[in-house]
Amino acid sequence: MVSQNYLGVMSGTSLDGVDLALVDFSQTPKLIAADFTPMPDTLRVALSQLVKKGETSLQALGELDHQLALLYADSIQRFLAKHQLNADDIVAVGCHGQTVWHSPKGQYPFTMQIGDMNLLAARTGITTVGDFRRRDMAFGGQGAPLVPAFHQAVFSSPERLTVVLNIGGISNISVLNPNQQTIGYDVGAGNTLLDIWIEKHLGKRYDANGEWARTGKIHSALLALLLDEPFFQLPPPKSTGRELFNLEWLEHKLTQIKPLPAEDVQATLVEFTVQSIVQALRQIENPQAYPCVLLVCGGGAKNPLIMERLQTHLTDWQVSTTTEYGLDVDYVEAAAFAWLAYQRIHNLPANLPSVTGATQAVSLGAIFPNI
């Protein structure tokens, strides 16, 4: 039997590392194996500085493009060895690359992901599909979010209103409403500000289980300032990233109130993440009064404090994780890029115009052959 295995490779806005998900598409998409490779500190810092400043030299940009491809290739080779697989066992790799800038508005809209796919295909010996977002933008879309199309394929049900919530660096939702077009969009800062703040004050990469945030108190004045951001008033479809929600943005907000203990800021940031999600969910129309199910994935799904606060606010929703529905919370996005590669190899449309704003559904990505 010919293999229908596709490997999704994803490094997100949190810059913590590379997620890999091997998915079998011979029948219903099935996650076969998954893994994670931490991002080296030097590379993470360089990428973080690039995203934060929005400027660099062509030399530095080119070198980061090369380094990322090497990281992806090494991650794939380790994955193959660990799971006793050969390159021939995989039809194609779907690699997102690393977003360093996303600017869907303006006279010349563009998005930029780096990580040389030519080098990745050559190093792994596996046909690679990359550069997914720009084709959607070429047809008038925002190039994001792309994952809702995968959510629709895997999680939709005619008997319920399902919202898939990914809390990664940025929080985004896919609204799978029976008898309506699927919509999906970014709703605010996910883990980005939480991670930035704890790294600044405690030198840690993230707040494990929300333990530090639990020691602080929610500050209502700061929360109101954070929520008073024009992005939240924009109608969907909309997208955002670290170019908005970053340390400079947060520190500017903090200058407008009296000094607070760092742990109180962290507690308030958790509530900010949760409230931005809750506000978005409250705006979803449900005229048929379908049962409402929230499926959470991404790093935030493993933060008990975030999950508790969501359940506190959403008493009329069933709050679950995608793991309970068959897809590990850590690897939903990586699995989505395996699906995007499958769609491209088969010349099938992979964007949802109702989500991205594109004028039509098209296949996404460029194919980089292994030879």
From Swiss-Prot:
Keyword ATP-binding: yes
Family annotation (Pfam families): AnmK
Catalytic function, reaction form: 1,6-anhydro-N-acetyl-beta-muramate + ATP + H2O = N-acetyl-D-muramate 6-phosphate + ADP + H(+)
Recorded superkingdom: Bacteria
Transmembrane segments: none
Pathway(s) annotated for this protein in UniProt: Amino-sugar metabolism; 1,6-anhydro-N-acetylmuramate degradation; Cell wall biogenesis; peptidoglycan recycling
UniProt-listed CDD domains: ASKHA_NBD_ANMK
Cited InterPro entries: Anhydro_N_Ac-Mur_kinase, ATPase_NBD
Name of the top EC class for this enzyme: transferase
Biological-process GO terms, alphabetical: 1,6-anhydro-N-acetyl-beta-muramic acid catabolic process; amino sugar metabolic process; peptidoglycan turnover
Keywords: ATP-binding, Carbohydrate metabolism, Kinase, Nucleotide-binding, Transferase
NCBIfam families, sorted: PRK09585.1-3, PRK09585.3-2
Protein name: Anhydro-N-acetylmuramic acid kinase
Higher taxonomy: Bacteria, Pseudomonadati, Pseudomonadota, Gammaproteobacteria, Pasteurellales
